[in-house]
Amino acid sequence: MQATIFSPRATLFPCKPLLPSHNVNSRRPSIISCSAQSVTADPSPPITDTNKLNKYSSRITEPKSQGGSQAILHGVGLSDDDLLKPQIGISSVWYEGNTCNMHLLKLSEAVKEGVENAGMVGFRFNTIGVSDAISMGTRGMCFSLQSRDLIADSIETVMSAQWYDGNISIPGCDKNMPGTIMAMGRLNRPGIMVYGGTIKPGHFQDKTYDIVSAFQSYGEFVSGSISDEQRKTVLHHSCPGAGACGGMYTANTMASAIEAMGMSLPYSSSIPAEDPLKLDECRLAGKYLLELLKMDLKPRDIITPKSLRNAMVSVMALGGSTNAVLHLIAIARSVGLELTLDDFQKVSDAVPFLADLKPSGKYVMEDIHKIGGTPAVLRYLLELGLMDGDCMTVTGQTLAQNLENVPSLTEGQEIIRPLSNPIKETGHIQILRGDLAPDGSVAKITGKEGLYFSGPALVFEGEESMLAAISADPMSFKGTVVVIRGEGPKGGPGMPEMLTPTSAIMGAGLGKECALLTDGRFSGGSHGFVVGHICPEAQEGGPIGLIKNGDIITIDIGKKRIDTQVSPEEMNDRRKKWTAPAYKVNRGVLYKYIKNVQSASDGCVTDE
C-alpha cells in the first residue's frame, strides 16, 4: 500500500482521494510516496486470533454473552457488518476556551472521516485540557502539569473500557502532547498523534506579536517603557486565531520531538493549525493507522532508546522548552524505559543549538513550515549524523526512509543555522548539580545570558510575592539571584510555570542583570538566566528551602554547578530548625497529585 505524505513546498497535489484540491497560497504539497509495508513483516498476513485487525474490539462484538455491549453499539448506529470492523478511538483535547484547542473538534471530524474511508469504525471522545496562558501567574497554574497525567489517564480509561483497537489523538496545548503519547505507551495499541498545529503570528503597525509579547508587556508597562494603551494593543494582536503558541515553546517543542520520535506523520508538527493541509493530514491518519493494525506495529516498537534520543536531538537543535525534560522522561517510563537527566546532558554536549526561533530568537514555527517543515530540519540533522535514521515510525517505515525524498531546507533560509555557525556550539539545556541541587536541576542557557552568574539571594515563598515586589521596585532585583521556592511538584502543588516572573524580569530590562532559580518549572516561552526543576524541592526538605536573603549563590554553566557559599555547618544548623510546610491543599485532585507525584528528575509521573 502506498500512502502520501506531503510537503508545503512543491508543485503537484498527490492523488485526489487522499488530498482534495484546494488553494494553499502556492505552497502545494509534493508527492512523497512512503510504503506502509514493514521491511520484515508481510503487509497482508492472514488474519488469526492474534493478528486480526479487531482483536481488541472483538472481545465485546463477537461473544453472544456480550449482548449488552452489542445492543449499545447497534444503538449508536453500527450494523452487523460494522461490528466486524476495527474500532478506533479518536481522542480530541478540544475545548473552546483556548486558541490552542478551539479548532480540534473540526480536526476530529476529519480524522473520523479518514478512519471510516479506510474501512474502520471511528468513535470520538474528548479529554480535558488546561490553558497555560490563561492560568499563568495564578494558582490555576497548579492544575497544568497534572492535566498531562489526567489526559493520559482518561485516554487509557476510555480505550481500555471500550476495547478500541487503535487510537488517534489530537492534542493542541503544551501538556496535551505528552499526555496523549503516555496513554499510547501504556496501552501499547497502534496509535498516531495528529498535532493541532501552530498559531500564526500577530501583526500591527509593522510589529510582530505572539503570546510572550503579551506576557512581557506587563514588565514593559511597570518599568515605564510603554503606556497602558500600548500594552492593550499588544494584547489585542498577540493571538490572531487558532493554534498553539507560535514560537519554540512547549507545544511546538513536544510536537517536533514526537515527530522526530516517529509517533506522528511527517510534517504534523510544522503544518499551521489553519492551513488546509492540516485537515488533509487528519484524513490521512486513518489510512496509516489501518496499516499499523495490519503490521501490528505498536508504540513500544517505535518509542525506543534510539528514537527517544532523536527526540532529544530535536529539542536541543531547535532550542526547545525545558519542559521536554519532564515529558520525555515520563514518555519513556510509560513504555518501560528509563531516561535520566544525564542522558539529556550527553545529548546537549553533542548537539549544537541551531534554530533562531522565539523565545530567544526571531522566528516562529510558521516560518519553519515555509522553509520545508520539520522533515526538512530532520533531514538536515540526519545528514549531519546527529540522528539515527533506522528508527521505525508510524508510516511503517524508518525515519531515514521517510526523509529520503523530502526536499532540503530552502536555499538561503536564515532560521536553521549551518553547523559552522551555530547559535551555541552545544545544547541550551544544561543539567546542573551542586549543594543547592544535589538531585539535579535544569537550566535553559541559550548563550545570550552568559555562562556564569553570582549574586545575593532574593528569596520569595511563591511567585505571587515576587511579582508584587518587582511591580513595586524593579531595580531592587538588579544583580540578585531571585529564588522562588515552594513551587515544586508537591509544594506548588503541581510545579507551576514561572513565565510571568521571567516575563516581568525581561520586560523590565533585567534579563542580563539577575538570575532566577526555582523548584517549579519554566514555560517554553521563558528566557533569561533561569534554572528550574531544582531537586529535592523545598517541600521535601531540599537545600533550596534553607536559603536566606543575602546568601551568595553561584551558577557556573561551564562546571555544571549551582552552589551557595553558605558553609555545610550553617546549612546543617538550618536543616535542624526546618519543618516541612503544610500542604497547600488537603482534598481533591491536587491532593491526589501530591500523594502520587514523583520528583521532577523522575518526570513527575503519577503511576509508579
Swiss-Prot record:
The protein's name is Dihydroxy-acid dehydratase, chloroplastic
List residues traversing the bilayer.
none
Which chemical reaction does it catalyze? (2R)-2,3-dihydroxy-3-methylbutanoate = 3-methyl-2-oxobutanoate + H2O; (2R,3R)-2,3-dihydroxy-3-methylpentanoate = (S)-3-methyl-2-oxopentanoate + H2O
Q: Which GO terms describe its molecular function?
A: 2 iron, 2 sulfur cluster binding; copper ion binding; dihydroxy-acid dehydratase activity; hydro-lyase activity
- Free-text cofactor note: Binds 1 [2Fe-2S] cluster per subunit.
Q: What does this protein do?
A: Functions in the biosynthesis of branched-chain amino acids. Catalyzes the dehydration of (2R,3R)-2,3-dihydroxy-3-methylpentanoate (2,3-dihydroxy-3-methylvalerate) into 2-oxo-3-methylpentanoate (2-oxo-3-methylvalerate) and of (2R)-2,3-dihydroxy-3-methylbutanoate (2,3-dihydroxyisovalerate) into 2-oxo-3-methylbutanoate (2-oxoisovalerate), the penultimate precursor to L-isoleucine and L-valine, respectively.
> Source gene?
DHAD
* A GO CC term attached to the entry: chloroplast stroma
Stored Gene3D superfamilies? IlvD/EDD C-terminal domain-like (3.50.30.80)
Residue positions of the active site: S523 (proton acceptor)
Protein source organism: Arabidopsis thaliana
Predominantly, its location class is plastid
Which PROSITE patterns would you find in this protein's record?
ILVD_EDD_1, ILVD_EDD_2
Top-level EC class as recorded in UniProt: lyase
One GO BP annotation of this record: response to salt stress
| Pathway(s) | Amino-acid biosynthesis; L-isoleucine biosynthesis; L-isoleucine from 2-oxobutanoate: step 3/4; Amino-acid biosynthesis; L-valine biosynthesis; L-valine from pyruvate: step 3/4
Q: Which family does it belong to?
A: Belongs to the IlvD/Edd family.
Keyword terms of this UniProt record: 2Fe-2S, Acetylation, Amino-acid biosynthesis, Branched-chain amino acid biosynthesis, Chloroplast, Iron, Iron-sulfur, Lyase, Magnesium, Metal-binding, Plastid, Transit peptide
Kindly list the places in or outside the cell where this protein is found, as annotated in its UniProt entry: Plastid, Chloroplast
Task: State its cofactor.
Answer: [2Fe-2S] cluster; Mg(2+)
Q: What modulates its activity? A: Is highly competitively inhibited by the fungal sesquiterpenoid aspterric acid, which is effective as a herbicide in spray applications.
Binding locations of Mg(2+)? D132, D174, E497
Pfam families the record matches: ILV_EDD_C, ILVD_EDD_N
Q: Which residues get modified to N-acetylserine?
A: S35
